[in-house]
Design a protein with these regions (language model features):
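Phosphate-coordination/substrate-recognition cap region in phosphate-metabolizing enzymes
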Residues: 1-59
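Short glycine/proline- and acidic residue-enriched helix-loop micro-motifs
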Residues: 57-77
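Domain-level recognition of soluble alpha/beta enzyme cores
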Residues: 63, 116-137
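Generic beta-sheet signal
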Residues: 93-103
């Protein structure tokens, strides 16, 4: 359980639901929460707010195809943003870091620590809401 884990610091997306979650988790911990713009969810552009079934979701997440969609952040730029964030925090002297983020961000984190998934795996990889995933570097 998350309450049994100790953290040095909390990094969080600045988006509302993530902020609320981080504040709930931190309620009795009193840790510093750093809201980092790089943890924002991927910009879905024209698909923002639509159902995954209304567009080719797996193609949207295809790293190899790196499709360009109107006003959307392409997947390779998105992964680079997350990888830059992870490079920054893993170069610091933290023992345990909590990252409160979104499912798309978690796709990039999973690839950063465990190697880039195939296009057939990236799209369908979807952790449960409020799931706890552990990584070591």
């Amino acid at each position: 359980m998350l309450r049994d884990l100790a953290f040095d610091i909390i990094f969080c997306s600045p988006l509302k639901r993530a902020k609320q979650t981080a504040e709930i988790i931190n309620d009795d911990r009193g840790l510093n929460i750093i809201f980092d713009e790089r943890l924002r969810e991927r910009n879905y552009g024209e698909f923002e707010g639509t159902s995954k079934s209304s567009f080719d979701y797996n193609e949207f997440w295809s790293y190899q195809k790196n499709m360009k969609y109107e006003k959307a952040e392409n997947v390779q730029d998105f992964f680079k943003r997350i990888y830059d964030f992870l490079d920054d925090i893993t170069s610091k002297e933290y023992n345990n870091i909590l990252i409160v983020c979104h499912a798309g961000v978690e796709k990039a984190i999973e690839c950063y620590f465990n190697g880039l998934m195939s296009d057939d795996e990236i799209g369908p990889f979807l952790p449960d809401n409020a799931s706890v995933l552990k990584y070591s570097k």
